């Protein structure tokens, strides 16, 4: 079939298997060109391994450290002749290239929040890997069923007051104002349950209790802090409460891993285009302006550059970039005053007429489509391709 992008709001409902493979290969090439990460992990579990920062972490571990990896994700396999999700194609491509390199690369497709998937993951580690020395937690989800069977929903809302935000209607390319009503306490609590640190702690406790964490094992969960422009909807909003919960839970995790001489850290990464960030009303405009400024200043980075740098400089670096709260920081270039001041100045100038001139909206759109395997150099999008791609190392629940 010939596959073209079909975008509905902040989701592309099609994905291109050849394009996704090429995108994964580009990220692998970046890592191999930038060299081995000294002292890196050798047996790695990545939770949320199929897209964005989680995929970049799996690639960095495998191709930067020579690590065997087990990935957990929740993706859609297309029925015969139908399209699979981008994350499915990404994971198939990752496995293909990792196995070619002689690395262990297996995957579990299912709800990482569930006890069933935790049990299956532990069984697989015991059988195939023995013990693991890094756990990357990179889950983003709209809802979570907790161990008691209660379904919690996450919400993107401000706290305390309604907020009117500038943004881009990405379908029409026009600047719009969106007013978001404040979250109720129930919505805040639900968001913390889904996107906070509770499930991360459940994972680490389960792995530790099963004795599958190696001495010196590390774990990290990803977060975003941002600056003034994004803080009403992000850090000071319902999602920010969840991210603050990560900061609380990591202290317990760090204490619990001390007996293994291990460590737990929250890692702060810069704003990038992901399926999660594209759903946040303010982010397409913010990212379009940020890309413009950081590209002009020569500091623009995507997921793979961020995560490879995090591994090399901080997770396994001799002088990790830590802030006063003990977080690892890979986002400092975004927060430079000269970057934020330039973005803020453009923010106040942007209109329908000049949005394509003073922002990199074209770059944002291209990055968004790349998530789904489109706009990748060297891919023939007029070619007939087979949408059915198997993941040979898939472990069924």
Swiss-Prot record:
Q: So where does substrate get bound? A: 224
A Pfam family hit: Eno-Rase_FAD_bd
UniProt-annotated catalytic positions: 234 (proton donor)
Binding sites annotated in the UniProt record for NAD(+): 48-53, 74-75, 111-112, 139-140, 243, 272-274
Domain of life, per UniProt, equals Bacteria
Q: Give site residues, Plays an important role in discriminating NADH against NADPH.
A: 75
Q: Which UniProt keywords apply?
A: Fatty acid biosynthesis, Fatty acid metabolism, Lipid biosynthesis, Lipid metabolism, NAD, Oxidoreductase
E.C. designation(s): 1.3.1.9
List the InterPro entries: Eno_Rdtase_FAD-bd_dom, Enoyl-CoA_Rdtase_cat_dom, FabV-like_NADH_b, Trans-2-enoyl-CoA_reductase
Q: Which pathway does this polypeptide act in?
A: Lipid metabolism; fatty acid biosynthesis
Which biological process, per GO, is one annotated for this protein?
A: fatty acid biosynthetic process
* EC category name: oxidoreductase
The answer on whether this UniProt entry bears the keyword Heme reads no
| Catalysis: reaction(s) | a 2,3-saturated acyl-[ACP] + NAD(+) = a (2E)-enoyl-[ACP] + NADH + H(+)
- Per the record, the coiled-coil ranges are none
- Any idea which GO molecular function terms this record carries? enoyl-[acyl-carrier-protein] reductase (NADH) activity; NAD binding; trans-2-enoyl-CoA reductase (NADH) activity
The UniProt record lists the keyword Ribonucleoprotein? no
Which Gene3D superfamilies is this protein grouped with? NAD(P)-binding Rossmann-like Domain
Question: What is the role of this chain?
Answer: Involved in the final reduction of the elongation cycle of fatty acid synthesis (FAS II). Catalyzes the reduction of a carbon-carbon double bond in an enoyl moiety that is covalently linked to an acyl carrier protein (ACP).
Q: How does it assemble?
A: Monomer.
> What is this protein's record name?
Enoyl-[acyl-carrier-protein] reductase [NADH]
């Amino acid at each position: 079939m010939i596959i073209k992008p079909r975008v509905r709001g902040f989701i592309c409902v099609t994905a291109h298997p050849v394009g996704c493979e090429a995108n994964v290969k580009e990220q692998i090439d970046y890592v191999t060109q930038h060299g081995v990460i000294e002292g890196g992990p050798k047996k790695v579990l990545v939770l949320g391994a199929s897209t964005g920062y989680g995929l970049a972490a799996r690639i960095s571990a495998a191709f930067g450290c020579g690590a065997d990896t087990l990935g957990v994700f929740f993706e859609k396999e297309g029925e015969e002749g139908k399209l699979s999700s981008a994350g499915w194609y990404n994971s198939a491509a990752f496995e293909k290239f990792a196995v070619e390199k002689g690395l262990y690369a297996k995957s579990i497709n299912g709800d990482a929040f569930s006890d069933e998937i935790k049990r299956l993951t532990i069984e697989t580690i015991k059988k195939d890997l023995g013990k693991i020395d890094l756990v990357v937690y990179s889950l983003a989800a709209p809802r979570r069923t907790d161990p008691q069977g209660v379904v919690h929903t996450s919400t993107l809302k401000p706290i305390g007051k309604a907020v009117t935000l500038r943004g881009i209607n990405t379908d029409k390319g026009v600047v719009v104002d969106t007013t978001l009503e404040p979250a109720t306490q129930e919505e805040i609590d639900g968001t913390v349950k889904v996107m906070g640190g509770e499930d991360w702690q459940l994972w680490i406790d389960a792995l530790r209790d099963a004795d599958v964490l190696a001495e010196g094992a590390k774990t990290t969960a990803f977060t975003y802090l941002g600056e003034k422009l994004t803080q009403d909807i992000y850090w000071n909003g319902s999602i920010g409460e969840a991210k603050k919960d990560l900061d609380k839970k990591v202290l317990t995790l760090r204490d619990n891993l001390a007996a293994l001489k291990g460590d737990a850290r929250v890692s702060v990464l810069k704003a990038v285009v992901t399926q999660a960030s594209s759903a946040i009303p303010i982010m397409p405009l913010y990212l379009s302006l940020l890309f413009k400024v950081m590209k002009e200043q020569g500091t623009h980075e995507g997921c793979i550059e961020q995560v490879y740098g995090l591994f090399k400089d901080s997770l396994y670096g001799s002088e990790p970039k830590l802030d006063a709260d003990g977080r690892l920081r890979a986002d400092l270039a975004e927060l430079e005053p000269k970057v934020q001041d330039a973005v803020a100045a453009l923010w106040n100038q942007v209109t329908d007429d000049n949005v394509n001139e003073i922002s990199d909206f074209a770059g944002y759109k291209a990055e968004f489509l790349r998530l789904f395997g489109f706009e990748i150099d060297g891919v023939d999008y007029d070619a007939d391709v087979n949408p059915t791609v198997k993941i040979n190392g898939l472990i069924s629940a």
